[in-house]
Amino acid sequence: MESSTIEIVGLHSSRSEHDPLTMNALVCTASALIVAVSISVAAPAGNYPSLPSKVLSNYTPSKVDSHDSETMANRANAFLSSLDKKLRAQAALPLNSPEKPKWTNVPPRGPQGGVRLGDLNEKQLETACDLLATVLSPQGYGKARNIPLADDRLLRNGQRRPGFGAEDYWLAIFGEPSPDTPWALQFDGHHIAINLAFHGERMSMSPTFIGTQPREFQLGGKKIVPMEKEAPTGLALFQSLTGSQKKKATIRPKRANLVAAAGRDGFVPDPLGLSCQNLKNEQRAILMNVLKSYVGDLPGAHAEYRLKELRTEIDQMRFAWWGPGEKGGDFSYRIQGPSVIIEYAGQDLGGDPHNHLHSMYRDPTNEYGARLGKKAKD
């Protein structure tokens, strides 16, 4: 498998006119309003607001020669070995722990779902970064690193605020990391919930929530954009459609919200929008780019395997659009097929629909790695 070098690259809903209002949307809306009135888009002055902020800002994870099952399991075990007894008890949970589906993107997070980054020392944080950079691609690690740093910009003058900032993110490992037997990893907090499952040389990433606020920020003189591709690739797909295709794809002239986010495991929305069966080759290529902006969070060969699966499902997929179809517009979209649900929605708080973003990736046939065991036997 490929050698990789880590390169750093660049939540809250409101009621939709078409989609059902879920409990998650209510909670997200309330949280979003709290954030909207307190956001400070300037980077914290002077020193870092927390040790996790310092480490995430400055530490470059060590390289790995491959992203095979043995390397991933070794990195997970190295992280667990770095913890004392108390912290390890928080981080290491049974494979089928009831905490696994309790992930949330809404602050504050309860203490049961893993070890808190703010409770780790510098070496432990670096080992956690090494682990995340091994089980994710550079694109995926960039999100896992940059979303907590973006959340630092929501702190009031850089001061501690429960549920916000890089120190209030949680890392959990379910089961015993092994190159042969099932185990899982969860990294969650405000605007992020990554659920990875492993079984032999197969892995999955469902369900995964990715969001950010603000959309971009400055770090070390560089512009960081945690969600760089999700909006432009989706917009490019919509703009590639013919007039009649756009009419079929468009559900409402107003942006909708996520309907398959936190607390919605097992929910499959009704397929809406344009059938992708008659897309031209150029449009199919753009659709694959949209899928890659999500699936590409998986490391190399795992992303390629998943994209190959999805390519065979294009004829069964639907593409739905809400809102205006121009750059900067307050829009949302959904791509849905037999084994994929992808949702994207801006939140339009403070008059900028792209400064607060939500997205969701699910494989309803493989939630928390449900079908990995079967694949391992095939």
Regions found by a protein language model. Give the residues of each.
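Bacterial N-terminal signal peptides
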Residues: 29-40
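Bacterial N-terminal signal peptides that target proteins for export
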Residues: 15-30
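A cross-kingdom marker for long, charged
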Residues: 43-378
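Intrinsically disordered, low-complexity segments enriched in serine/proline and basic residues
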Residues: 4-5, 9
